[in-house]
Amino acid sequence: MLLSKDVMSPVPDLLKRITIDANRMHGRPCIRGLRVTVADILGLLSAGQSRETILQEYPYLEAADIDAVLAFAARQADHPIIAAE
């Protein structure tokens, strides 16, 4: 399941948690304006870290932040690429 059981908000509301600011973290997508990037959390998840461990190591993050990271990544991966002819 993409969303945690305690999150009832639809994906567009989750995506509001992802911020992009050219003056923060070189414009990379961050969580709620914090200095934690989407790539940071994706890297931890892909390395096998559990959501619970990530939330313990980053106590200022919420379960919905991890849901937002996954929703953002899914949207980014779904962008079509059109080849130039």
Question: Model regions: which residues?
Answer:
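Small, basic N-terminal interaction modules of short regulatory proteins
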Residues: 1-85
